[in-house]
Structure formats: structure tokens, C-alpha cells
Regions:
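N-terminal cationic-hydrophobic initiation segments that often serve targeting/anchoring roles
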Residues: 62, 86, 151-152
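S-adenosylmethionine
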Residues: 91-95, 99-198
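Conserved S-adenosyl-L-methionine
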Residues: 73-77
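Conserved SAM-binding loop of SAM-dependent methyltransferases across substrates and taxa
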Residues: 78-91
Length: 198
């Protein structure tokens, strides 16, 4: 399989960041795999599922008011989706949160390699940073249904999370959920839920 680092038409504004995104991709495919941050995958899979998928989080963040504060990537693992979103949104602050000390160590090294001044790495459980008035993102860490359970006591929170597109049957008095559908390449569609606590 050949590797083509494409960006779908919905992400044309991200093409200026292609070289930095490819640097992160290279890091994931070497250091990320060698140190257990991600499992071994084909190069194209890593690009489509980890880089392009993450970029759609950034597209959603551009349209959310009150996201000028720090954005938390909970259960970030190898920096997914936080690193691609931070690379393409240099004026926003991101905190990558992971409970694994070894992952946090590697992410701190990556932050220095990529010279990411808008990124902090926090070695802690996700529960430790869930508070009112914040924006959170997660790709594989948690399901949308579990997000609804975990943030129901909070106020003024936005949580953007990968999903399978299922109906959440959320409490409409407490939550507003917008389900986004997008392509990561010419054929594959993915879903992200934007969950707001009222």
C-alpha cells in the first residue's frame, strides 16, 4: 500500500501545516510504535485515522464559542487528537492529559522536538481535570455515552469525542449534542459528537 498524505477538501486551510503534520506522522510511525504509544499500523492508516481524523476536531473547535481557554485532550495516548489540532491551531492552548508516566514522558519529548509552545503535558487521570467552564477533546479514550455520565454534574462544558454515530438519547434539558459526519479519505466516513452541558 502506498502512502499519500492527503487532506480532504473540508480541511484546505490545514494544507499550510502539511510538513509539520508529516513530521508528527513520522514520529508516530517510529517512536510512537517503538514506545507503545500506538500499535503498529500501515502508514496510510496512521495518516487517515490519526492525523486527518484529528484535524476534524480542530475544524469543530473553530466554530465553538468560549474555546479561547485551554483545551484538554483527555486520554491522549500518542497525542491524538491533541497534537494535530495544536499544530494547526497555534494560537490556542492545549493540555495533553494521560495517566501513563511513560506516555507523558514521550509526549514531553515530542513537544520539544516539534517546538510546540502552545502545548502542555499533564501526567494525571482525566477525572483530575474535569471541571466547569472548559473544553475537552478525546478520540479513543471514552465513548459518547460515558461522556454524558461523567460530565452531567458540570456546567458550561463542551466535550468533543469520536463516536460511532449512534443515537445517544441524551437528556435534552441538560445536554445539547450535535453529531458531525465527515470523510477521512475518498471513501471512509467517521463521526464526532459535540456534547455541550447547558
Amino acid at each position: 500500500m502506498t502512502f499519500e498524505p492527503q487532506i480532504p477538501s473540508w480541511g484546505n486551510e490545514y494544507k499550510n501545516y502539511l510538513e509539520r503534520l508529516k513530521s508528527y506522522h513520522d514520529w508516530l510511525c517510529k517512536t510512537g510504535i517503538n514506545n507503545g504509544l500506538i500499535s503498529e499500523k500501515p502508514l496510510q492508516y496512521v495518516w487517515d485515522e490519526f492525523i486527518v481524523h484529528s484535524l476534524y476536531f480542530g475544524k469543530i473547535l473553530q466554530n465553538i464559542k468560549n474555546n479561547d481557554k485551554n483545551i484538554y485532550d483527555l486520554g491522549t495516548g500518542g497525542g491524538i487528537p491533541g497534537i494535530p489540532v495544536a499544530l494547526t491551531n497555534p494560537n490556542k492552548l492545549f493540555t495533553l492529559v494521560d495517566i501513563s508516566e511513560s506516555r507523558a514522558f514521550e509526549l514531553q519529548r515530542l513537544k520539544n522536538i516539534l517546538n510546540l509552545e502552545n502545548v502542555e503535558v499533564f501526567n494525571e487521570s482525566a477525572d483530575a481535570v474535569l471541571t466547569d467552564n472548559n473544553t475537552y477533546i478525546s478520540r479513543c479514550f471514552i465513548s459518547s455515552k460515558d461522556v454524558l455520565k461523567n460530565i452531567k454534574q458540570l456546567k458550561n462544558v463542551t466535550y468533543i469525542v469520536s463516536s460511532n454515530g449512534e443515537n445517544l438519547n441524551e437528556n435534552k434539558e441538560k445536554f445539547h449534542v450535535k453529531q458531525e459526519k465527515f470523510t477521512i479519505n475518498s471513501t471512509n466516513i467517521r463521526h464526532i459528537d459535540v456534547i455541550n452541558v447547558k
